[in-house]
């Protein structure tokens, strides 16, 4: 199964007292080859940035610490 292992950074807004603080959330996930374009659009619509993309073959959850 062809997959992409992507690392992305997405801003998440949290309210602290009365001011807004912008925090970035980094995450790594496996995305199937067929869903890559949709996932890329989703991250960019959220104002995120894709940091790294690797081609990954094998089963989901193996060698990524997601198991």
Curated annotation (Swiss-Prot):
Gene source species: Thermosynechococcus vestitus (strain NIES-2133 / IAM M-273 / BP-1)
Native organism taxonomy: Bacteria, Bacillati, Cyanobacteriota, Cyanophyceae, Acaryochloridales
Main location: membrane
Role of this protein: Rod linker protein, associated with allophycocyanin. Linker polypeptides determine the state of aggregation and the location of the disk-shaped phycobiliprotein units within the phycobilisome and modulate their spectroscopic properties in order to mediate a directed and optimal energy transfer.
PROSITE patterns in the record: CPCD_LIKE
SUPFAM superfamilies for this protein: Allophycocyanin linker chain (domain)
One GO CC term, this protein: phycobilisome
GO biological process terms held by the UniProt record: photosynthesis
Protein's membrane topology: Peripheral membrane protein
Gene name for this UniProt entry: apcC
Name used for this protein in its record: Phycobilisome 7.8 kDa linker polypeptide, allophycocyanin-associated, core
């Amino acid at each position: 199964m062809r997959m992409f292992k992507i690392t992305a950074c997405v801003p998440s807004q949290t309210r602290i007292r009365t001011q807004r603080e912008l925090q970035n959330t980094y995450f790594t996930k496996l995305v199937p080859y067929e869903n890559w374009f949709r996932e890329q659009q989703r991250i960019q619509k959220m104002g995120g940035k894709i940091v790294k993309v690797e081609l990954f073959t094998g089963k989901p959850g193996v060698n990524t610490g997601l198991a």
